Amino acid sequence: MTNTLVSTSKFLSLILRHAPETIGLALDANGWADVDQLLARAASHGNAISREQLDEVVARDSKTRYAFSDDGLRIRANQGHSLAAVDIGLPPAVPPAVLYHGTASRFVASIREQGLRPGARNHVHLSATPDTAVSVGARHGKPVVLLIDTAAMQAQGQVFHVAANGVWLVEAVAAAFITFP
């Protein structure tokens, strides 16, 4: 993506995941925003985005962070929200027996003590492949991949969801379900 598209994607991430109020935008309970309102409010706050740019960001985003509604009139982030009022309405899903979590090595000691918590987000994010987890962990420093025993978690009643982009979501992961390198 060009620098302009990367900037637009970062702006969308802020607005659709964390702070729609910064441009006076309201998300519905499932995280959807009206596209016309998003574009108008963004422009009125100095971030002019054309519909063509928006379409291109959504289409070219390698992590499939955003989705349009079937009619193309609404947009939302597929996961990663920190807004407590947003429930993107994903049904429970049965994960593979093992999923992966990518993190930076400097966080491993804390995770050993506390497990994985969502922090400022609504869910802990898990990856289906070790390669994806490595790339996630590398964003924050020297990557470490943790193995998550999702079969044991499910046996104890934990509920999983899978976002449209393949990211697995769960409320938290106790350290007992994590295999550390």
Enumerate the predicted regions with their spans.
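Conserved NAD+-utilizing ADP-ribose enzyme module
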Residues: 1-124, 128-181
